Amino acid sequence: MKTKLILLYGGKSAEHEVSLQTAFSVINALDLEKFEAAPIYITNEGEWIQGPLLSGKLDFVEQLRFSATDTIKLATTESEKSEGEAISPAVLEADGQETVVFPLLHGPNGEDGTVQGLFEVLNIPYVGNGVLASSAAMDKIVMKKIFADAGIPQVPAVAVRLIDWKNYQAEMVAEMEEVLTYPVFVKPANLGSSVGISKATNKKELADAMTEAFLYDRRVVVEQGVVAREIEMGVLGNDTPVCSVPGEILPEGAVATFYDYKAKYQDNNTALIIPTEVDPEILEQMKEYAVQAFLGLDASGLVRADFFLTEDNQLFLNEVNTMPGFTPYSMYPLLWQETGLPYGALIERLVDLAKERHAAKNALKYKLED
């Protein structure tokens, strides 16, 4: 019997369009001889809409943007159900068929542990990281604390709350300028794909960048800018993760002063070098830090570790991404392709890891013996 693979994408997130691109790519790579593919589109308004079972490849991303008029509206994230009515969408029920959910969601309400919690409550296997790893890695402030506890080197940074910025802006700027030197990068704590991130080279730009970042989150992290190579590495597995070859991001002709949202997803001017050349000793250190980060987060399935490597060979772990993009030009699947694991095989491996993790969880004891 085929495995029913529920493909969940879209979502109430600034990264809604990225999620659609990821879903389009994954769906077209599925082996429909092995999987029964059931797409569910989450609209910008939070509605869950079930599309038809897929019988072939898609031609356009827009084919995934279902509407309630021509498909089945399953549920909504807003409170519209009457008291006592079941809240789990019927499509998530296995009905005796082996079922796995593949959440192709990015950003808040997607890779931050919230939707993962739903699958945990429903006891359905799902691809990728659990609640803890997803939420911790999504929050740049919490993530940095975990890395620091593991002894992983990071660039200097300062965390700022919106309430403190409103009440003590001058003092906060003074603290930042004491710890950091320009340029700095200002980032919302809970967002990915460089959304809301700005580079600041002076006090005026810093204030503008803080205003921009606080549009997306009430907590912001300000990081020291460094002149460095941007090198990424894929991590794959559960309890015994393995690393891919390293890849490097090279924006052509100074397309962007940093690898921003537009460069990542909206143009083809970003060059990826896979594998990239790294000193063997540094490469081993990179693998060690990537695995330490994976295990420190209690990650599962997949993680992409993003590093900075300076000219004098200082290595910093910038961040990890627990749901890296799967677009045709995304780094994570390309890293594994060059390591020897093709795209379709990578997807199947992730599904197998989801089943493995779910089985291990269900083997645990959840009640005391009489």
UniProtKB/Swiss-Prot annotation:
GO terms for biological process: cell wall organization; peptidoglycan biosynthetic process; regulation of cell shape. Mg(2+) 1 binds at D306, E319. Belongs to the D-alanine--D-alanine ligase family. Cell wall formation. SUPFAM superfamilies: Glutathione synthetase ATP-binding domain-like, PreATP-grasp domain. Mg(2+) 2 binds at E319, N321. It comes from Listeria monocytogenes serotype 4b (strain F2365). Pathway: Cell wall biogenesis; peptidoglycan biosynthesis. GO terms for molecular function: ATP binding; D-alanine-D-alanine ligase activity; metal ion binding. Residues 144-352 form the ATP-grasp domain. It is an enzyme of class 6 (ligase). GO terms for cellular component: cytosol. Pfam families: Dala_Dala_lig_C, Dala_Dala_lig_N. This is D-alanine--D-alanine ligase.
